[in-house]
Swiss-Prot record:
It catalyses: tRNA(Lys) + L-lysine + ATP = L-lysyl-tRNA(Lys) + AMP + diphosphate. GO terms for biological process: lysyl-tRNA aminoacylation. This is Lysine--tRNA ligase. Belongs to the class-II aminoacyl-tRNA synthetase family. SUPFAM superfamilies: Class II aaRS and biotin synthetases, Nucleic acid-binding proteins. GO terms for molecular function: ATP binding; lysine-tRNA ligase activity; magnesium ion binding; tRNA binding. It comes from Chlamydia muridarum (strain MoPn / Nigg).
Length: 524
């Protein structure tokens, strides 16, 4: 029997299927079609003002507000003529009280051999989804409670809930069975509610800045916009090799050429590469492009966007605590403006190396003595490539506060304009870092079609000399679009998953993805 169906042999599953059969024999449908006109538990809580509610006696007289809601039964205990439970929905829990003489089970025949309270005690289980009609009151201890008038079984659960104290202790099980993780852990629910809120706030900010949200193809005949290995598939209808996109960039720039002056897309990107604490092969990005901007305008947009999101999440505060660095917990302030440094300045400040004072041979020696990189990583590297390697190895993990690192070597990208100062060895690119990780990548976008072709062809020549590089053709449609004329523009890309990690104090990217990529469990 395969691992996926082992639960079919669990004693609890078998016991609950017997209950399911008995419930059906009583004439009750354990999986009804709908439960209309119910509200969220949090909405009920928001309505309540202490002095508006009476005690349980007032509820029994039906003098308190009546409510109708639904959720999962996550706690239950019998106490004589009463039984108490907790109902959990998306945002909140609420206590319910079943009473022997007052509470009824929807659909239970009047002449049934089992009473409503016995049905509740014997046929319902933790994990069942219930509809509740009842009356609000406060207990003597001050807990908001619903005296149940009618309970409706909306879904009979056949698998027991995770232990209420330890939840799902095994991380791999948590990631594979996220539904159970969400039920058992309030912190996990908060993380994913925050993720949805972050996406909403990003869209809100971009819309305020007059950006137009667009959609571009996930399946592409030519991939580009980043240095990454794609996932490859075949479109059977056209007998054509296709790729899952590794970036949103090229398609968005084509739209910019078409006259849509400010565009953004939030979407899935796929890279057939490693999996670690901050990388998943399938991840979510926002990329945005604005005509007539340069990378200075983009820097302001990025830091203001992130500050806007952080303030909305944290009641106006811009400081966030992150607990999962090797150096211990850190407080990070996302208030704009962020620290700005050129890449060379950052290597000098954080790495103690003034790269302009060293020859290429000396830079290789520094890489050999001060990093753990294999010799093949730098033995034939250009000066610009070695500067980028020194930054990666000596600087990145020291950038705890938000930084914009500007003016990268030309070799790092073929899609960016060189410095307007005339130094053609550097480009108007910045990357934003926080908590030792890259958060954003941005350019003053190259719109000279002849220079763009030259740089892409040079990139192809270098790849041809490197047996570890994967060849892929130049996107001629993109170059044709540039020939049509793309306005000067600034653009950026932000990894949404990494941003959510930072703002929810998550240790791993898997903690902010509902269903991260996992190794397949083979049949036994």
């Amino acid at each position: 029997m395969s691992a996926e169906v082992e639960y079919l042999q669990h004693e609890d599953y078998l016991y609950r299927t017997i209950k399911l059969k008995e419930i059906r024999e009583l004439g009750i449908n354990p999986y009804p079609y709908q439960y209309a006109d119910c509200v969220e538990v949090q909405e009920i809580r928001n309505r309540v003002v202490d002095n508006e509610l009476g005690d349980s006696e007032a509820a029994f007289r039906k003098e308190t507000p009546k409510v109708r809601f639904a959720g999962r039964l996550v706690l239950f205990r019998s106490m004589g003529k009463n039984a108490f439970g907790q109902i959990l929905d998306r945002d909140a829990k609420i206590q319910v009280m079943f009473n022997r003489d007052f509470s009824q089970v929807a659909g239970l025949p009047a002449d049934s051999e089992i009473s409503s309270i016995k049905f509740i005690e014997k046929k319902l289980d933790l994990g069942d989804i219930l509809g509740i009609d009842g009356y609000l009151f406060f207990t003597h201890s001050g807990e908001l409670t619903v005296l149940v008038e009618t309970v409706t079984l909306l879904c009979k659960s056949l698998i027991s809930l995770p232990d209420k104290h330890s939840g799902l202790a095994d991380k791999e099980i948590r990631y594979r069975k996220r539904w159970a993780d969400l039920i058992s852990s309030e912190e996990v629910r908060k993380t994913f509610l925050a993720r949805s809120r972050i996406l909403k706030l990003i869209r809100e900010y971009m819309d305020q800045q007059d950006f137009l949200e667009v959609e571009t193809p996930v399946l592409q005949t030519i991939y580009g916009g980043a240095e990454a290995t794609p996932f490859v598939t075949t479109l059977k209808a056209l007998h054509t090799e296709m790729f899952l996109r590794i970036s949103l960039e090229i398609a968005l720039k084509k739209i910019l050429v078409g006259g849509m002056s400010r565009v953004y897309e939030i979407g899935k990107v796929f890279r057939n590469e490693g999996i670690d604490r901050t990388h998943n092969p399938e991840f979510t990005m926002i990329e945005a492009y604005a005509a007539y901007w340069d990378y200075n305008d983009v820097m302001k947009c990025v830091e203001n966007l992130v500050e806007y999101v952080v303030r909305a999440l944290n009641n106006g505060e811009t400081k966030v605590q992150y607990s999962h660095l090797k150096s211990g917990p850190q407080i990070v302030d996302f208030k704009a403006p962020w620290i700005r440094m050129t890449m060379k300045e950052s290597i000098s400040v954080y790495g103690g190396v003034d790269v302009d004072q060293y020859s290429e041979h000396e830079l290789r020696d520094i890489l050999k003595t001060r990093t753990a990189l294999p010799e093949k990583a730098y033995v034939s590297a250009t000066r610009g490539e070695m500067i980028a390697l020194l930054f990666d190895e000596l600087v990145c993990d020291k950038l705890i506060a938000p930084h914009h690192i500007t003016d990268h070597p030309l070799e790092t990208t073929p899609l960016c304009k060189t410095l307007r100062s005339g130094d053609e060895t550097l480009v108007e690119r910045f990357e934003s870092f926080c908590l030792g990780k890259e958060l954003c990548n941005a350019y003053s976008e190259l719109n000279d079609p002849l220079q763009q072709r030259k740089l892409l062809e040079e990139q192809m020549r270098k790849k041809a000399l490197n047996p570890d590089s994967e060849y892929h053709p130049i996107d001629e449609e993109f170059l044709e679009a540039l020939c049509q004329g793309m306005p000067p523009a600034g653009g950026f890309g932000i990894g949404i998953d990494r941003l959510v990690m930072m703002l929810t104090d998550a240790a791993s990217i898997r903690d902010v993805l509902y269903f991260p990529v996992m190794r397949r469990i083979e049949s036994k």
